[in-house]
């Protein structure tokens, strides 16, 4: 699901760019027969201020905003990521806005906590989750070589739950798949460069 989401949501952004279409509007056009997905996407766009200009960074910095939408475990999640990219290609994910339709949210605080945790987990994979082999053996043996994100890498996360009367659906993992494509799409918006492999590397985005 995570790999599928990255492939489909980054490619949709490529198509939107080639068609000179807004990425959110482009997706909404294709969701006319999927009102649940459209509602989640519209909510995240509204809460993220998608239609408003993104605040400029410091001199030499490039900023971008990206979106992704995905369904897994019966739950629909849309995310908007905002990034700041330095001249040397290093970048920071500043903010992630998420909208989630998981049916009836029996415990809204738990839903928010799960989404926040999923963003952290997914960002770790997107930035640091590379597995390499040497002589048929995985080289990463501990957290020193396979690092989770540090607290300074964690973005501000906002979670918005769609009011629903439908039966509850999964919330443990559905916010993981859209994160990497949302960040990659934001980086493309900021730099004009597409990341065709994960994890996302500084070298890909140098000015």
Describe the function of each predicted region.
Residues 1-207:
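Cofactor-binding beta-sheet edge motifs in enzyme active sites
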